[in-house]
Amino acid sequence: VPKAGGPLYLYRLLAERPHDALLRALDFSGAPALPEVHRSPAQIEAARQFRQWAQDNGQSDLVALCNRYAEQSQGGTTRLLNGPTGERNSYSLLPRDHVLCLAAEERDLQAQLAAVMAVGSEAVVAESAVSNALLGKLPPAVQKRITRIADWTSDTARFDFVLHHGHPDQLRDGSQHLARRS
């Protein structure tokens, strides 16, 4: 008899899976009700303003990405799952608090920010000409959910997760640096 969360893990065994695999697993889990959503007004407003900013600036690809992330995001949700013997289990998906966004191109940074805002995390962005130009144009609610740092490699830089867009050599170097962090 499978455990209550079993269907959620089966998709991890596939070499390729549908983009909405988690949503399918949650829908077929026998959950009796819609999930409880635990997001602050600031999280909700930042995601809304980021999408609106993209729309106001004619960035239809970014708007579509924001919509897709919003539809698929399960960050901050709790679902009740029925167990094999009538027990009830809760399954919560909580976003990482601080997500380091590493991108050399503005378009890549925008995609990262769309993901971070959709799940309800706060972005940590290394200062650069590209990031400074973009961040200065963003709405206030979005800017409040972004921390700028001069040097992400500093031991004082605080983040829980990393999103990287860039050259494989940069990824390798960044991964080695992250592995050395205490």
Q: Over which residues does each language-model region extend?
A:
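C-terminal segments
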Residues: 1-102, 106-112, 119-182
